[in-house]
């Protein structure tokens, strides 16, 4: 009689894509640094500025010019349009560790860009032919020439009474319309996010601006800059969008926050609805599973792990069932 235990079979031969999953929800996000437990100290996120834009190849420049013409026509006809805001392109980055304590460090080099270039490049990657030509063999630990025209911050806001806020993005925004998202998602903007010591952007200034414009939360009244914690860095491979994920605990209750949004905030059009959810792994996972499409998995995962530990978050993934469609 053979008493040997049956050996496990080989894993599926299909190669894993290496992307983050929020429990049962697969995503196109690749985590490049951070696990939710470690934090970036403010002095360890360093930004630099190269004051010269990259010149687009002819095919991309033609695409950008077409977008500009379309948006100008829409404006003239009284139709929804996108204005050409000044933004930053990420030229390159370096992930390292601080020598004495091995704290996470991130160095970022930026160039000037604009929103129409972003639409013509990153947001056009949904077209298979363009994607195949420029992203057929990509190393996500390197920036992609001409397709790095955005850098953002994504924050889970935690209220004084233990809630977090989810949003449903507006119908007429340029990226991910009507998707369910985290509390604050903001892209670096020139020159308003410029640091105090030069033209390089300050990611904390961007985070503060996003909280003010999208939720009506203001520094020194509702939170301090020291309350903003960045926990991870990565890239959404669908559109080659890179950014930082983090969390912030505010001094305002959920009822006061929702009331302020109802009464009016600067960029209310960016979100069509807010949702208040108790900030626990079980409640957050349940909301994510029942509201699709759901974008902010990496942001919420890092925030939950930082607050409750990885084991409880993974237990919530196992215990909360996906709704039947």
What are these regions (language model features)?
Residues 212:
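Juxtacatalytic substrate-recognition/specificity segment
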Residues 1-209, 217-325:
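N-terminal leader/linker segments that precede catalytic domains of diphosphate-processing enzymes
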